[in-house]
Amino acid sequence: MPDNNSDPAVSMASRALGNPWAGFILALVVIVLDQYTKMWASNELVYRVPVEITSWFDLMLAHNTGAAFSFLASAGGWQRWFLAAVAMLVSVFVAVWLTRLEQQQRILGVSLGLILGGGLGNLIDRVTLGYVVDFISWHYQNWYWPAFNIADSAIFCGAILLLWDSFSSERGESA
């Protein structure tokens, strides 16, 4: 049966996304963007002083010694290496998973690439600085979402795609 997709650019992009190594390239892009934006935030923002962008969005430099939502942040220091070890183990697991993907598992490859890049971006901070640099702050009136960064956003988007892929795979859809 002839290929109905006659656009070579679309076909090439589809093949590239279907390549399991594309996940590693995406992870590298996430790491570079994450580290660049954290470096910018650390150089340009004053610690804990918000810069209002809109009525619901600020840039504010914060240092998170804990995990997501500052979990374990006040644990006394032991959490740095514990969380680094957990991040390293998860990263190895995700990297191995990426190498075992099949050509048609595009969404799964993207999700794992986002998760790997985000995890490694935060791991770099945790190991080199002892904390993770956060700088994106959303709020509504006096309710504030915990500050986060590009790596956190990549992990979140990757987790959503992972869930979507698992549910669409259960229904027998090809992702």
Describe each PLM feature range.
Residues 1-175:
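Alpha-helical transmembrane bundles and membrane-interface segments of multipass inner-membrane proteins
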